[in-house]
């Protein structure tokens, strides 16, 4: 397991099985277990809470996204139960991610959990990274103690990554998606599971909207900018949540997850397949731009269609419909401050604004031209590169 905040050095540690679920084992690294939970040490009761919570969400998530792989790679894909000591159960390992625990959360690496596909490769060992040979993801013990809501939402997020590895890579001969696309799907998983998990908006991906409004121009919609990761998460969720709320909700996400495409092609194919349309990606991008200007037809501020249901377990008599609820990107809760002023909605650049480079992969810069009256107006643009597009939006 990792031993530094960059998740670049790994060490071997002993862990003990502290909870067993229908679909999972919860292991706690011995250094971070205590009979009484506190700070970065968890007890068996907390481990069981997470096992129980994961057991409930597992069939709900797989109903939408599909299943994780029961294969492990060893000179070809082989049955995991023949090569893994934990069989086909999912292993949730709890410890201090980054080995950086502090009583002050802002001194931690900020990683609540992660999935690492190395564990799907039998006896893999390279540059200090070694496979645990099975289905694994990892949860931070400090967060597991202090913030159940964030941690349980992270379990849903990381499980989607595990499922996505199967749906896109294992089942499609090594197909690889962009990281932004994978993160988008994981945040949409959190989004549709929010009501079931009892998560407040401030602990959900919707909370990224403030970052999006203030800094969307630091990451293209279809980009994962390693220097501004927080902005890439925000732009990916903004676009993905718009697509889900306007073109089919959880049923659309199901098609995105399960089709044999990735990235923009996957999204476009799923939208057209579900809606009987012939949109290009550029068509969808244009509609998304309208939402950033407060359009009432294409908007984040509408509930997604609820056409997909889960009707088992706790929901056998009252099906769960995977609600993805409306949120207004112009609300005060998503406002930001700059130069002593408060702003609502995505930042608009005017003539005296700072210079910002347009990001690749569908980067956006919103420029305000001004307010006009009268029957006609002429607006002139200087020509840019062939890769740049200018959209003129009049309100």
Where are these regions (language model features)?
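Zymogen propeptides/activation segments of proteases
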Residues: 1-41, 51, 60-64, 376-378, ...
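Glycine-centered structural positions embedded in regular secondary structure
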Residues: 8, 15-17, 113, 234-236, ...
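Juxtacatalytic substrate-recognition/specificity segment
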Residues: 22-178, 185, 196-197
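Non-transmembrane alpha-helical segments in soluble domains
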Residues: 51, 58, 62, 156, ...
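Surface-exposed intrinsically disordered loops and tails
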Residues: 76-77, 86, 105-132, 136, ...
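Acidic/His/Gly-enriched intrinsically disordered linker/tail segments
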Residues: 149, 153-154, 169-242, 246, ...
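Acidic/polar loop patches that form or flank catalytic/metal-binding clefts of enzymes
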Residues: 201, 251-254, 282-283, 300
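Beta/coil-rich, acidic/histidine-enriched accessory regions frequently appended to metallopeptidases
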Residues: 262-395
């Amino acid at each position: 397991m990792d031993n530094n905040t960059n998740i670049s050095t790994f060490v071997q540690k002993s862990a003990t099985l502290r909870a067993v679920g229908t679909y999972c084992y919860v292991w706690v690294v011995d250094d971070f277990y205590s009979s009484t939970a506190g700070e970065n040490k968890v007890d068996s009761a907390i481990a069981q809470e997470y096992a129980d919570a994961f057991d409930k969400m597992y069939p709900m998530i797989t109903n939408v996204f599909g299943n994780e792989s029961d294969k492990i790679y060893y000179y070809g894909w082989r049955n995991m139960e023949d090569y893994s000591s934990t069989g086909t159960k999912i292993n949730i390992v709890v410890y201090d991610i980054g080995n950086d625990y502090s009583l002050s959360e802002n001194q931690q690496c900020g990683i609540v959990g992660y999935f690492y596909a190395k564990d799907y490769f039998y006896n893999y060992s390279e540059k200090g990274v070694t496979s645990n040979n099975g289905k694994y993801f990892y949860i931070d013990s400090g967060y597991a103690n202090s913030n159940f809501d964030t941690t349980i939402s992270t379990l849903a997020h990381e499980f989607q990554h595990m499922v996505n590895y199967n749906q896109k890579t294992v089942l499609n001969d090594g197909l690889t998606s962009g990281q932004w696309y994978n993160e988008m799907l994981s945040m949409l998983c959190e989004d549709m599971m929010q009501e079931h998990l009892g998560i407040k908006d401030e602990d959900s991906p919707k909370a990224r909207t403030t970052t999006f409004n203030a800094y969307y121009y630091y990451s293209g919609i279809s980009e994962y900018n390693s220097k501004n990761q927080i902005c890439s998460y925000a732009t990916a969720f903004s676009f993905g949540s718009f697509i889900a709320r306007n073109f089919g909700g959880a049923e659309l996400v199901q098609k995105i997850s399960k089709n044999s495409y990735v990235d923009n092609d996957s999204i476009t194919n799923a939208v057209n397949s579900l809606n009987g349309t012939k949109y290009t990606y550029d068509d969808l991008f244009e509609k998304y731009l309208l939402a950033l200007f407060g359009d009432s037809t294409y908007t984040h501020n509408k509930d997604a269609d609820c056409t997909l249901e889960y009707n088992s377990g706790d929901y056998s008599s009252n099906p769960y419909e995977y609600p993805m609820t409306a949120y207004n990107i112009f609300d005060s809760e998503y406002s930001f401050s700059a130069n002593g002023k408060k702003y609502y909605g995505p930042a608009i650049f005017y003539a005296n604004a700072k210079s910002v480079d347009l990001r690749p992969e569908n980067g956006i810069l919103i420029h305000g031209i001004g307010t006009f009256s009268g029957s006609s107006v002429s607006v002139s643009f200087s020509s840019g590169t062939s890769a740049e597009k200018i959209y003129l939006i009049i309100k």
